[in-house]
Amino acid sequence: MKIKTVNLFENYLSIKNGLEKNLQKLFLKQSFILGEEVNNLEKNLTRYLNVKYALGVSSGTDALIVALMACGIKKNDEVIIPDMTWISTASSIMLLGAKPVLADVNINDGTINIESLKNKINKKTKAIISVGLYGNLPDLESLKKISNKRKLFLINDGAQSFGSFYKKKYCHNFTSISCTSFFPAKVLGSYGDAGACFTNKKKLYEKMKKIRSHGQLKKSYSVILGLNARIDTIQACVINEKIKIIKKEIRRRSQILNIYFKELSNIKEILFLKENSYCKSNGSSAVILVKNKNKFQKYLKQCGVET
């Protein structure tokens, strides 16, 4: 028996009928760029997360680039990020000519260390990117206080934390802009690349909306520098179906995580990353610390367990 890290087929069976029906409608309508499905997705996301604005984009990486551009990040600016994160957190900054500055993370939970962050702030610092790694969250209130005091933009890289709670609110509510990824393996995943930006600030939303589509105010009328970062309409159809079962999916993942914690917590050679008391994780990943990662991965592979 092979145990996969993600079982996409099982998830597909839960949405099969509704998805195939809506895809057929889309193909008959021949509307593949933005349109009704994308508008519906953005409405569904705002309702689910209780945010004012949602913007579908082409990937989680593009979501970060759009967010940074909307915040005016430019060449030689500095943006502080945790030193344990996915490469896109850093590369999105570098693609704009700015510099990612690495702050330490807490060894027990993998989130950005507040004191290390404070020590990295200088005159060139323009923004902080917080990362909800593996569904766990940093101390967003402390980060918000620091960013407000120092007049910095606070961006949430929530690629792995869609649906995670910070003190009874979804984590996408606490920052200037929050981003997520709908990569297939995510808690809310598409069947290709897709992502989204969220904000409660109208000016940032309107700027991001222009950036998403070549800086256009309207068709063929570009007013600022922009990207081709529109979400694929077919992927919007997929996510519209999957969001109907997202709460069930998060509950299922959390139940599986609890089984891992219960059955493996007595093994002294294995340590789990701690879930912070103010966080309710979306169950994105089960992450453990071991002395010899490569040896342990090899053993799990021999047992038919993907990592």
Labelled PLM ranges:
Residues Q30-E78, S92-L96, L102-D104, K169:
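Phosphate-binding glycine-rich loop
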Residues N156-Y191, E206, K218-V223:
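Conserved active-site segment immediately N-terminal to the catalytic lysine
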Residues S92-I93, I146, Y170, V187, ...:
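Hydrophobic/aromatic ligand-binding patch that stacks against planar heteroaromatic rings
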Residues G56, I81, L102, C197, ...:
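Conserved SAM-binding loop
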Residues M1-S31, E36:
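N-terminal "arm"/small-domain region of PLP-dependent enzymes with the aminotransferase-like
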Residues F9, K21, E36-N44, Y48-A54, ...:
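PLP-dependent aminotransferase class I/II
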Residues M69-G158, F165:
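PLP-dependent aminotransferase-like
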Residues L55, I80, V101, L154-I155, ...:
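Structural detector of well-ordered beta-strand residues that form the stable sheet scaffold
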